[in-house]
């Protein structure tokens, strides 16, 4: 089963994937789709064109191509990625915990002290590919706050399910959640 949708002016078929017995989601994947990545980055930048911000910030992994393309198109020299684990090159990393609809159990997000120091006092736009329960977005926001940054906006390609009702995010397109038979909940 697939769900047909248009985002950033492009038509795509999203495979419908089981999360639980009564919850299925449309899998939005930019990996390997250069055309979609470029178009979504362009339109995400339009959402914040009047926003004063210093840096873009996301969590690995599916949003990495998007944030890179957003930086390329906007001329930004630096962006930040919260990692799912500490890396040897991260001096004195800080971290927060997160629960995501697509990740089993608790996941931690890490940021090296060097990046945290660059974020301190800066205006940050959080970006994610899909906002669903808001767990990943909340964890990113907590990590930015822990680093001393100021979140000025939250953007995503898609708002899934109840996230469409949120007033604190901007997004390019809505994405419903599905029943086992592929019908919209």
PLM feature spans:
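Active-site-facing substrate-recognition patch
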Residues: 1-53
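PRPP-dependent phosphoribosyltransferase catalytic core
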Residues: 2-4, 138-185
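Short glycine-rich phosphate-binding loop at a beta-alpha junction
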Residues: 53-60
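Conserved acidic residues
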Residues: 54, 122, 152
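Short, ordered loop/turn segments at secondary-structure junctions
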Residues: 61, 84-86, 159-160
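Short Gly/Thr/Asp-enriched flexible loops that form oxyanion-binding sites at enzyme active sites
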Residues: 65-74, 141
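Short, glycine/charge-rich flexible loops or terminal/linker lids adjacent to PRPP-binding catalytic cores
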Residues: 77-124
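Conserved G/P- and acidic residue-centered "switch" motifs that form tight phosphate/ATP-binding loops
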Residues: 129, 134
């Amino acid at each position: 089963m697939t769900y047909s949708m248009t985002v950033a002016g492009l038509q795509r078929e999203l495979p419908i994937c089981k999360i639980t017995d009564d919850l299925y989601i449309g899998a939005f994947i930019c990996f390997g789709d250069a055309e979609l990545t470029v178009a979504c980055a362009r339109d995400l930048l339009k959402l914040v064109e009047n926003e004063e911000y210093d840096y873009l910030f996301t969590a690995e992994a599916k949003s990495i191509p998007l944030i890179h393309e957003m930086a390329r198109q906007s001329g930004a020299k630096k962006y930040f990625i919260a990692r799912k684990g500490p890396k040897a090159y991260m001096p004195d990393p800080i971290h927060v915990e997160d629960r995501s609809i697509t990740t089993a159990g608790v996941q931690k997000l890490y940021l090296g002290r060097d990046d945290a120091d660059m974020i301190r006092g800066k205006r940050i736009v959080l970006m994610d590919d899909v906002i669903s329960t808001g767990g990943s977005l909340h964890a990113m926001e907590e990590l930015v706050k822990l680093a001393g940054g100021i979140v000025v906006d939250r953007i995503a390609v898609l708002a899934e399910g109840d996230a469409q009702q949120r007033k604190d995010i901007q997004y390019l397109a809505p994405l419903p959640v599905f029943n086992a038979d592929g019908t919209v909940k």
